[in-house]
Amino acid sequence: MEDQRPPLSWLDAFETWEPVLRLMLAGETERAAARPARVAGRISQYGWSLAHRGSLSATARTRVEDIQRALARGKVQEVAFRAEVRPDGRTTLGLVWPSPVVEPAVGYPDLGVLVLAEGSLPEPWLRRPDPAPEAVPAPSADPELLERTLRERLPDAVGATAEEIAAAEARLGVALSDELKALYRVARVDWRGDFEGADRVGDAVGCELSGLDDLYAVDAERRHSGWGHGAMRALSTAPDAAVQGLAGSPGWIGFGSNGGDEFAVDLNPGPGGHFGQVILVDHEQSLGAELVADSLTDFVLGRRREERGGRRGNTLPAVAKVGSGFLETIETAAHGALEVLSIGAWDGAPFSLAPLAGLPRLRTLTAAPGTLADPLEIAGFSGLEFLELGVRDWRVLLDARAVPRTLKAAAIKVRDQDHLPVAALANEILALWDRPQIAQTLIQGDLGPATTAR
């Protein structure tokens, strides 16, 4: 049957976008004041993000859905757009197409984050666990009691042999805790469609139990949600923390779930933890884990912690924000533990970055347009891996050949007047790392002159 969806080339016609642009321009006052109006948005196969308050008109909704069908037919995930509309109606529309070097991110309607180093991750996701050679099991850890309890609850279960457990240890590259071995000596878990058996074991253990062959180490890279979010995060391990501040660890051995979150036995606990404690890895979080039981014995016997802790979020001193409503000086934020600094909107004099010189852990810097006194001060920061600046500040760095080569990812913060040149500027940044260029289609059209309200 003939495909009735519009072809992808249909998106190159100005008329395709006219209903969407008119919707987004409704109520704008810029053109009536003899100034260009600018709009931006993003449409994907499964949704859209348009700077428009209220519901879509029937005409605009139909057109958006047609655009979605064209994207689906062309097997293109999404298209971002920006338009500049002059008072007389002449319009320049820029379409930005998906690129393998761009991570779409909230707050970046037309581009996203430029990935400069293939496969790179922010530092917290690369962090390895500190050795814990002195860690011992909790007093409540009792492999014999655990095994006896499970045999009483699961009298017909088939357990794993010593050889099978040893093979699992060899595959994982770690020695399992005595409690975890005791659990699998009772039930090796090989369902083969036996859902009732799975339910019985789940009830006995207290979670959806994975099979011995399915044990895994919680992988930090799998939890990475993208540079736009990850570059702004930091984790630390307090001196008395039970769980180390990590994204993942070879010593976090996932053995079950609650249907969404993961339960793991922790073989690399924090300074205040115990070897073999049970932690929860929240599927809605990309960093950290929470202590839920001091031992697997406690976990199975239902002696779980009511008050959980262990996650460290965006708290000073590792993460700081300067600007209106936050810290008012760079000096206040600058200290040896600082990793992430965001400079937001500010009505005062632009900031000097001199107080940041020499900070050993500074890896992320974001600055709203117009907030930096001298962008070239950035050239002296030797450890930056993520940088977000406005168009003019990037222009200064590019012209001076002073873009830090330590960067792994970057972003361009856009203000009204900077709309359409962003893709070209991004391509200049990408070229420094020999990365593929972003494709942009420029379309000219006419929406007619602005109407003056009476």
What is each residue range found by the language model?
Residues 336, 357-360, 370, 379-382, ...:
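Inter-repeat linker/turn residues at the boundaries of leucine-rich repeats
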Residues 51, 126-259, 369, 391-408, ...:
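A surface-exposed partner-binding patch
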Residues 279-309:
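Compact, glycine/acidic-enriched structural inserts
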